[in-house]
Amino acid sequence: MSILEKVQPIETMLPARYYTMSTEDMEKRVREIKEKMGKMLCIPCHHYQKDEVVQFSDAIGDSLQLAQVAARNKEAKYIVFCGVHFMAETADMLTTDEQVVILPDMRAGCSMADMADIEQTERAWRELTTLFGDTMIPLTYVNSTAAIKAFCGRNGGATVTSSNAKKMVSWAFTQKERLVFLPDQHLGRNTAYDLGIELNQMAVWNPNTDSLEYSGNLEDIKVILWKGHCSVHQNFTVKNIESLRKSHPNMNIIVHPECCYEVVQASDYAGSTKYIIDTIEQAPSSSKWAIGTEMNLVNRLIQKHSDKEIISLNPFMCPCLTMNRIDLPHLLWALESIERGEQVNVIQVDKQVTKDAVLALNRMLERV
């Protein structure tokens, strides 16, 4: 190898050769590397990932389950995370310094997580403190950046997932009189309402105008919701439900709580990704279901439960575009880079951010 070759930087974009490889060859190479590395390698996959990636997963789950997998895994030196950026950050923060977390495609982000940056959040906290004093505790959905998790950790708050949101919101109200919930207003609103908090006791913080939007009395506000949302679940509407009720009156409708309040109220069931999966699995044969969540998962449930009639609540839905960034070529590239000792797309969260964020994560993990 020449000196020039030695100093060339490691590639940061998928090399062209992976575009020309056959699916069979790529699958064969992934299996070879997995067999060779054994327990030194762990590939966790989120439920929204493509089947071409999920087939190689060592663990598949929702955000809570994958956080627990990362926290428990002490054997794997390399964790190749098939999800989006905030999930890989969480895995890095919950694993040891000796473990390496890799995201196959760094473009796999999350629009919801990007709706709350740390500067906006700190500014909002200062403004809200002038209104409410020391009566607030922050909770962040795990679909947030490491910096936002760290902010919550520093301020006595915690993280939540859609699986444990009720438990964590209930806990938060044992700590303070008011709750600031970010970045997903819909999960926060749906959870708070389920716990008996009225809509006029909730306000929305708009980070674009630095203003608090509310209809009731300011002193009665118990929940401040960040004005963020999931770009996928935002596409399920009450019109979808009304249309389905007319065309399929016997269809059960189940949605994720990232859908808006009106959609959740008009549905028959609402719950986390795990809740949706479990409900469909336990449903009687020949039952009929319209599901309001990400399309890769819906398609997987359709394939797995051929004895049931399953459709998407929105007939024009597409998969989560950022989740779909992770594909077989990127997975193989990540694995071959490990094999060569030239890891690409390593996720490393700042140590102080990690220290603060882990406070928030552990407050959640201790209660589930």
From Swiss-Prot:
Residues annotated to bind [4Fe-4S] cluster: 110, 230, 320
EC numbers: 2.5.1.72
Cofactor note: Binds 1 [4Fe-4S] cluster per subunit.
Catalytic function, reaction form: iminosuccinate + dihydroxyacetone phosphate = quinolinate + phosphate + 2 H2O + H(+)
Cofactor(s) the record lists: [4Fe-4S] cluster
KW Iron-sulfur (keyword) present: yes
GO molecular function: 4 iron, 4 sulfur cluster binding; metal ion binding; quinolinate synthetase A activity
Pathway in which the depicted protein is active: Cofactor biosynthesis; NAD(+) biosynthesis; quinolinate from iminoaspartate: step 1/1
A Pfam family it matches: NadA
Keywords: 4Fe-4S, Cytoplasm, Iron, Iron-sulfur, Metal-binding, Pyridine nucleotide biosynthesis, Transferase
InterPro entries: NadA, NadA_sf, Quinolinate_synth_A_type3
Major localisation: cytoplasm
Compartments, as annotated in UniProt: Cytoplasm
Residues involved in iminosuccinate binding: 46, 63, 141-143, 162, 256-258, 273
A Gene Ontology term for the protein's cellular component: cytosol
GO BP term (any one): 'de novo' NAD biosynthetic process from L-aspartate
Role, per record: Catalyzes the condensation of iminoaspartate with dihydroxyacetone phosphate to form quinolinate.
Family of the protein in this entry: Belongs to the quinolinate synthase family. Type 3 subfamily.
NCBIfam families listed in its UniProt record: nadA, PRK09375.2-1, PRK09375.2-4
Name recorded for this polypeptide: Quinolinate synthase
Classification lineage: Bacteria, Bacillati, Bacillota, Bacilli, Bacillales
